[in-house]
Each structure stands twice: as C-alpha cells, then as structure tokens.
C-alpha cells in the first residue's frame, strides 16, 4: 500500500486524523497515520498539495500541527507545530518555500518551511478578524489570499504588500424589510483569467465579486436551496460552480446568468469537501455520511465511483494528473 | 412516528412500569447506520446489569421501520416463559441524523432521508 501511494487518485482527511488514499482504478483505499492510534484531537481540518508538483501533501490537524506526507514514499515525513490564535485550521497554502496557515480566530501566519525545525517564529502575521470559515490562495498569484467567515466579510490580502487588505467586500443592501443581511462566507474560489472571486454562504447564496470593478458589492448573486452551503468548486471551463449544502444536495450554478444548471444526487450527509478535476468532467465529493463519491458532471451526468470509508470525511484532494487510466504494470 | 397505541388502549396490560429500568433488545440493526442508531436507542436507558425487574423494551427493525414494544416476562416453568405487554407501542422511521445538537436550519446532517432518492427501490434498505 505504501509503495502504490503515488498512484492514488484521491486523498481524503478524516475526523479521526487518518489520511486515506483511494485508488479508483484498482478500487482500493489505504489508511496512513502518523503514529499509532487514530485520535479525535488530530482531526484533519485542511489538506493542500506541497511544493514540487503532487509529491507532497500538507495535512493540517486540529491540534495545530501541520504534518508533511510524501506520496512518493507513502509515509509521513515530519510535522510542524503552528501555535497562535484559537480554533482549528481553516486554510493551508504554500508559496516559495513558506507555509501559510489561517486559524478560526483570524490569525494568518507565514512560516518558514523547513521541516527539520519543529517550530519557529512566524515570518509574517496578519489578523483578518474573528470567525474565519475559509482561507484560499489564488493559484495564479500565490501571494494573494482571500479570507471570509461568519460576520467576517470577504477580504483579499497581498502577503508581499501592506498590512491592509487589497480588496474588502461590502455587504449587500438591506433587504425588503430594511434589515441588514447577515454575512457567513463558507467557501471562496478565485476565478481563473480574471480577478473575480466567488463565495458561497451559509445563507444559501452564491456571490461573485469583482475587485477590478468600482463597486465593492457583489456583481452577481444567486441562491440555491434552504440550507447552508458548505463547499464549492469550479468546473473545468470555469463558467459554473458546483456547491454542496448540509443536506447533501449538490448543484451546478451558472456564473454568467446566475441560474441552476442541474443537480447531482447520491449524498446523504453534509458535504464537507468538493473538488473537480482540472480537465476531465469529474467531481469528487466527501461528507459526513462517510462515503467518497466521484460523479461525472456532463455527458452523461451520473455517479462514477462510490467508496465507503469508515470515518467521517472532512476534506479531500483530487489528483490533477491526466493519466488516470494508464498505470505502470507491477514488475 | 406512526401506529401509536397508548397504555390505556392496550388490552390485558400489566401494571405500571414507571420507575423501573428495562432491559433492551435491539433486533436486526445490521447496516453501519443501523448500528449507530441502535446504539443511540440503547444509550437512552440507564445501563443496569442487575436485572432486578423483569421488564424488557424491544426495538425491532424491519424494512427501515423500527417497532417499539415494552413487555414484562415471567418464567412459568423451566422451559416455558410468558410475556405480558405493558407500556405504549409505536412505530418510528428515521428521518435524519444530525451532528451535534438539534439545529434544523444551520446544523450539519450526517444522514438525511430523501424520499425521491432513497425510497425508489423496494430492495434497498438503509437501517
């Protein structure tokens, strides 16, 4: 299992602290733990790819440690303790040999990324406001990050720039009863080839912001369902997003017109992680019903794979490589 | 919850079971979800291994419906025993399982019963 770790298609982090690697071609799932027994204190709250392609995974755990996992060797290589602030990790990112962490109380820290030192002082520290639900890095400009949360408006920060945010979103106008609309940004995505951002909220809204335009209010707003939207991902082609809510409903929403394109069925629990493949029309979803599902988004829309993984799944990483089917033969 | 029969509607019932801790029987909770739900029912009652009173509460799962009965048993002879029905009887179906405390609007659901997705086939059972 350790030798075949590099061919795993999906990596899933669970509430018990185990990293599971799933190979959809061979239909196998393997568990990887840092040490011994799985524990609730080490619940995986954030996953991201490390430096150098997809050879390393950074696993952020609830006890404020970031563990380094090598997919080439199939084992954990080291860990780094990241103190400061309260709450679990809400975002992990890596740029230029530094590690960016964001916790729930709003402390964003940039750490020097040498895993030989167990802990060191942060290079940079930002306070983004309490109640953060997500911190996302712009894949096109790795030094830009966006943060948002409950009663914490969307802000885009430049880590190489000043301490003030580059873009601070404004709340929408008061509703028809003249009441302030509450803010609860649950997930953020950067749209490629433009400066726009999409957020999905706990009040079942999907909003598009454009920092290049003079208005700080959302450019487009769409709603779906009656339950909080918990996860979001962009589709290949980037004209639509797929959102999931706490009832397990997955929906594809067009960003040009703001209308519902279609739904995906199958999930029975709250959606915790969603990711689309960058080129193929495949969507991986995981949630509290302990099953990892891979759907095909178009022609035809339906379920491709379903894998029962015994613990509650918190986050996932889908391998973006193209040679899904081609596997080298065992010698 | 459906098919509720309150205590006064049950014919030939026994005396009041109030204050006595019954034993629990869980029947047919086979799937992973069924096992979790069955454990939750068992933990509703205090755990008492003394078996003082001869009362037993049965949760029987058949085709995603859970039937609840409360009986008192006596041993008439070595091999034969008799039961007497006390207590209410009802049938319940699982609608949803939430993570954390009850919050129907903003809470996370571990399992939600979706009528048009899950009840299409008669052969597919969840609990």
Question: How would you name each of these model-derived features?
Answer:
Chain A
Residues 1-9, 16-18, 27-31, 36-46, ...:
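Terminal intrinsically disordered, low-complexity extensions flanking WD-repeat/beta-propeller proteins
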Residues 13-16, 60-63, 102-105, 148-151, ...:
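Conserved strand-to-loop turn within each blade of WD40 beta-propeller repeats
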Residues 2-7, 47-54, 92-97, 135-143, ...:
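Loop/turn segments within WD40 beta-propeller blades
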Residues 22, 66-71, 108-113, 154-158, ...:
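WD40-repeat beta-propellers
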Residues 35-44, 50-51, 81-90, 124-133, ...:
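WD40/WD-repeat beta-propeller blade N-cap
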Residues 126, 131-212:
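Solenoidal tandem-repeat scaffolds enriched in leucines and small polar residues
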Residues 30, 77-78, 119-123, 164-167, ...:
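A structural motif specific to WD40 beta-propellers
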Residues 79-141, 172:
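Asp-box/WD-like beta-propeller blade repeats and closely related beta-sheet repeat scaffolds
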